[in-house]
């Protein structure tokens, strides 16, 4: 970015208009572009055109990709806590195993990826699953965490609703 600043400074007399270089902090957390836009980053002076840059570690060094419209998806992290009835592994009939329910939820999510979501501008990935701390006790809870990413608000809302509905319906089926 420093090199770009130097180049732009060298040709500033040839430029028609103003140039703003904006750095987007914490784009995958509470930061990102929206709070900056709401705070007026695109005004004073007004921005007529914007170009974005995002590092792509899988792209060969020296190559760039150019695309009109959205190219990087917005992330929505999710965490699901499955509540069961814990107990000793010798008496599973007295328990509701949250690990079993959690694996069923993850399986249903993968089915969504392969069917409903396969042609949509989104992706949903389970990245964490944890239930229990030993090999002879059924735990009280299990946790599932992941990320749902989408390129537009309509798809984002559909994806969040679908994940919530699928998790609740699957849990209900299993006790």
Q: Which ranges hold each PLM region?
A:
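Histidine/acidic-residue-rich, glycine-tolerant segments that coordinate divalent metal ions
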Residues: 2-4, 8, 13-139
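A general alpha-helical scaffold signature found inside nucleotide-binding enzyme cores
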Residues: 97-100, 158, 162
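A common structural junction motif
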Residues: 164-174
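A general structural motif
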Residues: 127-130, 159-164
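A conserved active-site cap/scaffold subdomain adjacent to cofactor or substrate pockets
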Residues: 135-161
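Flexible hinge/switch segments at interdomain interfaces of large molecular machines
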Residues: 140, 174-175
